[in-house]
Amino acid sequence: MNSRERFLQTINRKMPDRAPVFATFTPQVAQKMAEYLHVPYEKPLDSMLSTRASHMDLLVKLGNDAVGIATCAPDNFPAKTLENGLIENEWGMIFKPMGLYNEFHIYPLANVETSDDISKHKFPDPLAKGRWDEAEKTIAKYGKTLGIIADLETTLFETAWYLVGLEKFLMDLMLEAEYINPLLDKIQEIHTFYGRKMIELGADVLWCGDDFGTQQSQIMDLETFRKYFKPRFRQMFKEFKKVNPNIKLAWHSCGAFSPFIPDFIEIGLDIVNPLQPLATGMEPEILKSKFGNEVIFFGGVCVQDLLPNKSPDEIKAEIIRRKNIFGKKGGYIVAPAHNIQDDTSIENILAFFDAAKKL
């Protein structure tokens, strides 16, 4: 069974020869692994969550059974470095490079109050030239041999607060500020187009996501989620299924996300990610017993403690345990619960792939 067959068997709830593997790296990890393997290091793509679709050749060499694709900045608006070293993207978000990640520095809609403020803001043009070039290249190279996962994370909530600022946006949700619905409608419009396009290009899984969880709880209550977000996700999922009724919809939310899972299943979710095991209520046994008959599990290998701090033998044993729990009767994609971070040794990364690829 080749990688694509294995991946398709899994997402269609059939038993593969083994669980497929899909990991992602931070750029620092990709660089040190490329040096270790004596292969060229490729810079990350110019994309909102670039790690999901970058370094694919390297990750396939290590053992990934699928590759990621994503929307990229168009030819006429690549991310640009400003005079003070800050970075601006096509949404108008301005970041400050801070070690392993870029941190938000200026929110372009920090002073938003009304729908007029939304109408005046310049949003990305989904039809801009060059946006799909990298996705098309990846599919042309790997589409017949590996699974294709299309990234559409920061689907609504996160893009909204990236524009406004987290504290203000959460407060304005509670205050029912005038601009909230127009802003969410505009983001929904753009990301629905992106999702439909990536399905048309040949994606097998559309990987949506917003982080609704914290380590111990949720960032908002279910009432707020059901008022502002769930109806929009329902509409988006319907649009995606119109393009391809067989597309599998994955949802990423870091943290203690389990209270939201039934609502997502109700509106058509197929795959849950990233299964952050140290977050409250995200223990593998609990998730499998509650939702194992309804969703595919994608993730679950701890990047907070297991991969950086344990021995290779401990890592291998824990991955076998994850496969035995989540993968019983199929339905599991072996993956870290986030990008593998730079505090993880080469030895432990190799141990992850070695154990993940075993039958």
Question: What kind of region is each of these model predictions?
Answer:
Residues 1-44, 88, 97, 101-103, ...:
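Active-site loop segments of alpha/beta catalytic cores
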Residues 51-70, 200:
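Catalytic domains of carbohydrate-active enzymes, especially glycoside hydrolases
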Residues 107:
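Catalytic and substrate-binding clefts that recognize carbohydrates or anionic sugar/phosphate headgroups
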